[in-house]
Amino acid sequence: MGGKTNKILKGAFAGLVSAVLCLPLMAGCGGGAADYTNVIKLQDNQALLTNPDMGFNFTYYANTIYDFNNTLHPGDYLDDFPCDTIFFRIGWNWIEPEEGKFNWEFTDDIADEWIARGKNIAFCWVVTYPGDQSTPLWVKEAGAEGVQYAYTAESQTDGSVEYIMKPVMEDGTLGAGDQRFSNLPKDAQDYALNRGNRNDPAYNNGEEVTEGDYENYRGSWVVNYDDPVFLEKWENFLKAAGERYDDNPAVQFVEIGSFGDWGEGHNTNTRANSISQSTKRKHFELYLKYFENVQLMVNDDAIEGTELVSFTKENGIGLSDHSVQVPYAGGPAEGMTGNVAYASLYWRDLPVLLEHHNGTTFMETYYNAIVDCHATFARINCDPYVASLSEWKDMIARKLGYRLVFSEVRTTDIYAGAEVQIQFDMTNEGSAPCYAGGNPTFYLVDSLGRVHATAVSEFNVRDLSVADRGEEAESMTGTAVLQIPDALIDDDYYICVSVVRDENTSYNLPLDYQDGTRQRYQIATFTVGADE
């Protein structure tokens, strides 16, 4: 290497305030271990990133087979959000229409298209959808007990119609019910009364029904959630689902949906079906039995006010909250703002998922809820092309989950044979921790992409704190040591950085100059060549 020198490639990287690398083999070169002679300033490039175990998920099926897949443009996989997970909330009866005969292709055929593009899938198999059948009726025929419900319409003095779901009594009359779906416009009233959402494939053969026909009149039979026959059949379903999906790396999460309205763990519209704490725990245990690898999520309504918070946390079950923007009596126009109190019990160790109401007028409310609840996942629970969502999606994407940002890297002199001391500053500018963690890693790479030296920091990005709304993320400092080889051929060389989770996974970072398809980013460059 005698008679050769390293020269800086001036202006190679925008945003490098100072990258004055030491010229090798010159007198005085190679300062002390803490003599950081090179300072590299880095900036968040504001890119919209996807990363493992976080981000947007799109509701392809929302309890029924009609929303929101019918709004999705053909061939669009929502890369511009970016959305990397498609979510199926679908009635059990669609997947197991006959006992032991599974129609997995109903969702898998769609899922395969997304997986082929490097995306993920997620599920919530629903037992109860108020108004339409979700439990296959062969469960009832096998002896399970439950309650038949039907909707009735009551006209109000202002001309609106309020729909009330009531249990059908043994004598054919309707019992007391709870108000739901107030102030629907007239065209929606006719649809709700005469067509409904038809969640059952064999629902009245697709024909309109008449008032008083309680078996078909936009109602449903709801199983008792502690019924032993039901639990046996449901366990068989979960066993089959676990065998199919638990070892599939493309499955992002499974939401627990086997009790309560829409699988949300509450019985607001089906109060004749009680849900005890012991019943809830039994359902949780069944999911845990058959899903040992996939992240499980539970709705906040299923655990609120119970000792099940501790049970779910101890067993690694994350929190899902579907309340954002949901209107309520006497509340503000933007509706509910997210269950911050319960999210605070989970987010430091487990992911939080938020779902907004299917209206999208108040997307600022959604953004604030994501920040306040420190959400990892956010659902696109609407037509993905509505203007109000388009205005906020980029801002949400830059905040949702974790966002690992290097602000400065400092090094000692870099030359052949040097033991380069590296110090760096990082923040997590996202809303949630990077739960799986990872280690900042530095590389010496030549122009052909060959790695000549690697330095793995002991610093773990899992330890980066996240800020509350209105506050700045705390910067933390880590170190690494990069041993430069004694001999380097004439070439251009790059100092690159990445954050590595495991041998197969590195994170996307908001930096320019990515090293090919790898998650390595060039932050400085120099050449080895003959003296001029």
What are these regions (language model features)?
Residues D35-V229, M336-V371, A375-S388:
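N-terminal substrate-binding region of glycoside hydrolase catalytic domains
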Residues E255-E292, M297-A343:
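Substrate-binding cleft/loops of secretory-pathway carbohydrate-active enzymes
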Residues L23-D35:
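Sec-dependent signal peptide cleavage junction
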